[in-house]
Amino acid sequence: MGLNLLFLGVLLLPWASALLVALFPKPLFSISLTAVFSVAAMYFCTTAPVDFKIAYPWFNLGGQSLNASFWANAPAQLILGLVALVSFCVQLFSKSYLAKDPSIGRYYVYLHLFVGSMTLLLLTDSILIFYGAWELVGACSYLLISFWHQKSAATQAAKKAFLINRFGDIAL
């Protein structure tokens, strides 16, 4: 049961962090939450079986049960560890790079949402959740790229990324 709870924590912590950072937009608080996520993710990756599967009941429709199912095989666990490490490094770098930006809290919210979307995309075993996570990753990419929306270059780059993501969506 402990491993299931840890997995649920790894899955939900970035989303909860986005909400908490939206309420308390302090860089050190955001970095601390990412550190907790990183440690939890690394601990999960080192203690979970190589082929970890879990399903949570989502809803019943006409006597049929639809589950939110997740699967963490060895490659997914490795990539989860990399996502945790890279997101922590990005947060550390961002603290000094964006130190004087008044909108740093918004940036950290977008970053936590992006990490949550990536984690969900990586670990889901459900096509519906996969598609939703795919769309969320695209939306968060757009928001992060257009963070400095006052600059023309950022706006143009965000539009370009949005269009490229749409082509990827068509292929999906």
Feature roles, as predicted:
Residues 1-6, 16-109:
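Transmembrane helix-loop-helix hairpins at membrane boundaries of multipass inner-membrane proteins
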Residues 9, 37, 50-53, 125-128, ...:
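Generic detection of intrinsically disordered/low-complexity segments and helix-coil linkers/edges
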Residues 11, 70-71, 84, 123, ...:
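Short conserved micro-motifs on helix faces and helix-strand junctions that flank
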Residues 14-17, 69, 88, 115, ...:
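Bulky hydrophobic/aromatic packing residues
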